[in-house]
Amino acid sequence: YSTPKEGLISGIKFNEEATAAVFYSRRDTSEATKDLRDIFYADLTAERPSAECIVPSDIKGLPEGMGISDKATLRLSKDGRYLVLGVKELPEPEDETVPDFEKVSLDIWRWDADYLPTQVKINKSRFERQTLTALYYFDKPGQILMLADETMPMVSIPENLTGNTVLVLNDKPYRVERQWDPTPRYDLYRLNIENGERELISRNRTVRSTLSPDGRYAA
């Protein structure tokens, strides 16, 4: 879809009642800004619904070198408090002054790397789609709250969540070990989605845990 006002539009999602919608927009279609995205919100209950930009590509809280990712599925919380979105590292611009025949590609093997080069190649498409979870609170406009980062990339917000706490699994400390031991291991954290604070609950776990919707109990 496209409109003269919002430019290229993608990833349209509605809330459960279909009273609101969010979508990605690429307002500047020039090559220099091809990786930049804004997020728009539309109140469909209005007499004449119109979309407004709530998450611009340079919003406060976005880490340096990162951008809004249209690979993540936008989702409005059931209570309408926040929007779940994804953030990714922006690709570095290619050096067009170097001819293709002079460019060299190398596989660098390091003993302490999270993934072997062969794993990176096999899972290339999955890694490229991977995003870091962030939240936009409607009562705190002009900023986003990063819940995930490079040290703890796996954060999932359950759709039935009613409280402010989620469980986070962090496998990063055990990725090198996984190269010879297939047993999945991770540290378990409790994460407050209102302020981003994390609390370590348990280390070196081999079984997954679930949290009650209100965030009071974990099993």
Language-model features: locations:
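Beta-propeller folds
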Residues: 1-219
